[in-house]
Each structure stands twice: as structure tokens, then as C-alpha cells.
Amino acid sequence: MPGAIVGIYGVQRSGKTLIAYKLVKGLQQACKQQGIFLPVYTNLYSPRDPDFRFVNSMDELPLDLSPKVVLIDEIYNGCDAQDYRKLKDISIFINTLGKQNCLFVFTSIDAQMVYNRIRNQMNVVILVKSSSTHIHYRFLYLNTGKYTDFVVEKNAALFEDVYYDTNFIPLDFDWEMKS
């Protein structure tokens, strides 16, 4: 199976990390019900979630054909579209991703802050907007040109079983492939 890319965009505190976490966690749980363990490698600090493996470097990701999810929160911290020194390593990662059994999910404030080769290969874009009472999500399916809107109410139930540290600011992800 070739890799797939989901980009999630929204302003700070809009709910983009929440939907990324719930999407990946839901996929992981669906696989678990089928008897498949789906590892998640992420820069989200989730010490209470044993199924999420904290990584902060390309070298920490296994480059094999086993199914996996890579979730990078605030991707522009390390994958800036203007940082030309890192583009070679990011290009290698994208080429590797295309040949792997990997779902790559990332969040960003703005699409222009993300390297264009990642943007151009996205399969799904999720736009996030938040009010004091609701979070609005628009899922854009780039292969079909269709979209679906979801609105969720902000309440305690929405944040049940959410184990990442919402106050943790992701470090710059190291895109260099040393090995």
C-alpha cells in the first residue's frame, strides 16, 4: 500500500491537534479490533498513552514495510517551506513515505508554512475553525474534489481518553536522515 498524507490546518487552539489525535487513535483502535497492532510515531508528548511512541527525528522511524502512522504536530517547526537546507532530507522522507505502508498526518497553522512537495501529495485536508462552544471541521478529499463538514460541541466528553499534553510545545522535528 502506498503512503497517504493528511494535512490539518487551523489557528492556534482551534482543535487541529485534537482531531489529529482522535483520527489516529480511532484508526489504531479499529486495527486493534481486527487483531492488528498499528504503531503510532509522534512528536506529541503523550506519557499516559502507551500506544503512542514519542519521536523527534527521522532516524527514530522504522523504515520497513510494516503499517504505521506518523503524526507530526506543528510541522512547520522543522519543515518550513522556506528552509532550503532541509529540503533534501524532506524529499527523501516523502519518497520513502510513498513506498511505505504509512499514514502521515500533520498539523500546521497555515498551508504556506509547509514544504510544497508535502502539500502537493496530500490526499485529505482538514480545515479547523473554533468558536467558544463548537469546533468546525471541513474534510476536503483532494482525489474527488468533495468535502464533508462536521461540527462538534466543546464539552467534557470530547476530551475523554485524550492523553496528550496540551501545554507541550513540540520541538523542531529533525528531518535529517543520518543512517
Give short role names for the model-derived ranges.
Residues 26-41:
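Post-Walker A helix-loop "phosphate-sensing" segment adjacent to the P-loop in P-loop NTPases
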